[in-house]
């Protein structure tokens, strides 16, 4: 999963052994082959480069993407796979407890319609790491009845709390990015957990600007509505 210089690789062709070259032999020798890939690899590139992928499992532990597993089969094994579509399973373990997998296909994601929120409601949701990696962003909205804050933010909101597969927050205050508004919002806050989604500044830049230390009980999200 690393090259000879110790750098992380992001393409199958950069990895050793070269699974793309070995794939015909693998599916010839084994009816079902599971290949463990680097979580740094792009899923859509993997789908283009590997011909016999039937399933993809994206595994996260304590909200960090750890494994990208692909199941290779030369022949389709069950009627449910008759369309030849690849099933993607997002699996998350938190404190040694495995949550319910989120299973989907990319055609389902393409057809899904997720409403956009006109404003931030009572609760805010951030998808778990495996979901952010796999990208079922529209389906999350339709399956859990939540709204996206923005088409490109991947943050969701709702009036009532739902059992969402990720981090869930009760919204206490919403502020614009104006100097006066921010001063009021950050009054008495010198430490906070800061997340940036679809925003023209990095976490490091905002920490420096707002003079915030990392950690504490306050969670701040900088995003575009």
Where are these regions (language model features)?
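SAM-dependent transferase fold signal centered on methyltransferase-like domains
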Residues: 1-225
């Amino acid at each position: 999963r690393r090259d000879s210089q110790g750098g992380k690789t992001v393409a199958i062709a950069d990895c050793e052994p070269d699974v793309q070259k070995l794939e015909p032999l693998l599916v010839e020798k084994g009816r079902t082959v599971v290949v463990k890939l680097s979580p740094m690899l792009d899923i859509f590139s993997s789908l283009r480069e590997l011909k016999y992928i039937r399933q993809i499992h994206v595994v996260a532990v304590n909200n960090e993407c750890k494994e990208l597993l692909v199941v290779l089969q030369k022949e389709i094994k069950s009627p449910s796979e008759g369309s030849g579509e690849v099933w993607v399973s997002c699996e998350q373990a938190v404190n040694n407890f495995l949550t319910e997998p989120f299973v989907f296909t990319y055609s389902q994601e393409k057809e899904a319609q997720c409403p956009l929120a006109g404003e931030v409601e009572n609760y805010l949701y951030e998808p778990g790491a495996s979901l952010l990696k796999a990208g079922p962003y529209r389906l999350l909205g339709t399956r859990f009845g939540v709204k996206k804050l923005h088409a490109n933010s991947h943050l969701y909101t709702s009036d009532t709390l739902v059992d969402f597969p990720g981090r869930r927050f009760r919204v206490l205050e919403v502020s614009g990015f104006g100097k006066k508004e921010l001063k009021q919002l950050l009054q008495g806050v010198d430490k906070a957990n800061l997340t940036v989604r679809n925003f023209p500044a990095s976490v490091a830049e905002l920490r420096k600007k707002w003079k915030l230390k990392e950690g504490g009980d306050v969670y701040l999200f900088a995003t575009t509505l």
